[in-house]
UniProtKB/Swiss-Prot annotation:
Enzyme class: transferase
Lineage: Eukaryota, Viridiplantae, Streptophyta, Embryophyta, Tracheophyta
Origin species: Arabidopsis thaliana
Positions of region (Disordered): 263-283
Gene: CRK28
Positions of modified residues (Phosphothreonine): 528
Protein name: Cysteine-rich receptor-like protein kinase 28
Catalytic-site annotation from UniProt: 486 (proton acceptor)
GO annotation, cellular component aspect: membrane
Catalyzed reaction equations: L-seryl-[protein] + ATP = O-phospho-L-seryl-[protein] + ADP + H(+); L-threonyl-[protein] + ATP = O-phospho-L-threonyl-[protein] + ADP + H(+)
Transmembrane region(s): 289-309
Pfam families per UniProt: PK_Tyr_Ser-Thr, Stress-antifung
Amino acid sequence: MEHVRVIFFFFACVLKIVPFICLAQKDKYEFPPGFNCVASGGNFTANSSFAGNLNGLVSSLSSLTSKPYGFYNLSSGDSSGERAYAIGLCRREVKRDDCLSCIQIAARNLIEQCPLTNQAVVWYTHCMFRYSNMIIYGRKETTPTLSFQAGKNISANRDEFDRLQIELLDRLKGIAAAGGPNRKYAQGSGSGVAGYPQFYGSAHCTPDLSEQDCNDCLVFGFEKIPGCCAGQVGLRWFFPSCSYRFETWRFYEFDADLEPDPPAIQPADSPTSAARTERTGKGKGGSKVIVAIVIPIVFVALFAICLCLLLKWKKNKSVGRVKGNKHNLLLLVIVILLQKDEFSDSLVVDFETLKAATDNFSPENELGRGGFGSVYKGVFSGGQEIAVKRLSCTSGQGDSEFKNEILLLAKLQHRNLVRLLGFCIEGQERILVYEFIKNASLDNFIFDLKKRQLLDWGVRYKMIGGVARGLLYLHEDSRYRIIHRDLKASNILLDQEMNPKIADFGLAKLYDTDQTSTHRFTSKIAGTYGYMAPEYAIYGQFSVKTDVFSFGVLVIEIITGKGNNNGRSNDDEEAENLLSWVWRCWREDIILSVIDPSLTTGSRSEILRCIHIGLLCVQESPASRPTMDSVALMLNSYSYTLPTPSRPAFALESVMPSMNVSSSTEPLLMSLNDVTVSELSPR
């Protein structure tokens, strides 16, 4: 009977973890684009034949059927002249129906953003669309351009870095150019340098180009690197006829996870085709049979291994201890699942090793204490410094955070996210091990009158851009799509070079990319009041726009040097809320007065643009807030015109007394900005 209960609990564990392993990466397209209205192409009049043809072409997109290769060549009009020509192209991993939807949206927005322009192009995250009054099919075009850089340069092995980068891109260029008339795309990896052991890249041309034109277009793009972004650990370049990308982390799907191309049509009497199909397992049908057989076998084997481990563990422990520490069963399953991705061997850390590293968790090594435990500085025997988070044994919420951080952070790799080095399970002990961040958290600098004088505008702008890239990775580019839910200054750690790293994923939530246009709800609201979006604080409704709101608050805090205390302060109960104050100054055209007086240098136009972006992020309506993809575009491209912000959501204090919010074990402080359920992040 006891074994039956163990097996039942095991299934409950598996069901709990399935969302983490089954949520495949799916890209979306509903992001504000990078427009370029080609001024050199001239203009047309609203009542011209070209205007009618262009509008007709865009309208006809809604009646098209999706194509298998993500490429659309379109034209509208008769032979009398003033025909409209257009091309649409999607990234390789975008599903067919999503691709067509992306191009439809891009086309509609492009003619709205570039009215009466003869030629224009727009790049979305996952597709591009261009139109012209001249034939563009089969003709290489390398202007205009759009580019993004990571903002971080390689600090050593520069020559080797540049050589291996170009070597990888050149190899991908050759593969893409030879791709044939349906698709000219290549993705792949290559050897890197110390600190970045693997390089990743992609190259893409519109398939209407000849092999030579595709090659020339990409070469033209590669030649841009030395003048703008040599040594950058990440970059993207977009041209009307081609694009390429280089990163030090895998940003693309594996080939096996991509939607397969349709089989090539062979003549019915082709013996070569028949023989090839037989040798490959009767084509697609054979692979489906193999998948149908292999998947159940894998799950049965996984179940058998888990069950054996569970029963062996149970045999060596008393029943009372099992009941008292039931979550260790779930954690054993987590280890097995991590082993599937070759993480567990390197992530599991022995308890005695951590005791030695922290001098038996000495109070002298304690960096901070939060609602779910303490954080200690430690040093491994090899000299590596670490931050050790020891969760409280009595905190049920700590269990939840522990599982979250292992399952998420173990598979998240980004320069602007804190890195999980390992974890430990020893009886009642639950311990997480992180990289050690020397400069502690952002709040220690930005809210300290003396320390924030060390932060010139260049450093603050780097912080804003780094946090934006980290959130964009969580929302769009990571293996999982994640809503952080507790972004705040104390959860932004700063390394030795003041690069920001997002920390504390205990409250993070996975979300299904098929449902990104809708909101999710929770009856248990957790987070920090000053950074909570109103729809989340009041109704428990959250989405990626919840993180965008928190980011906007953070941007305004970084620029003003003030905390968002929701209309209260320690010395003045009638103090004006930070967002309210900034909004009032914006409306009264005295916005320069909100800039931190210690910011004596730096581009005022750049600072004002960041305030503008911050106000867009804290708008009351979630639908009005930009996505992080859009924010990254706003920060990197001054050609993008910022929309006018609407009223921020700053009147939260009126609803706070009636809200059922999870609280930490710490007493509430005077500032509502500090009311939080999050523990102190590793430093």
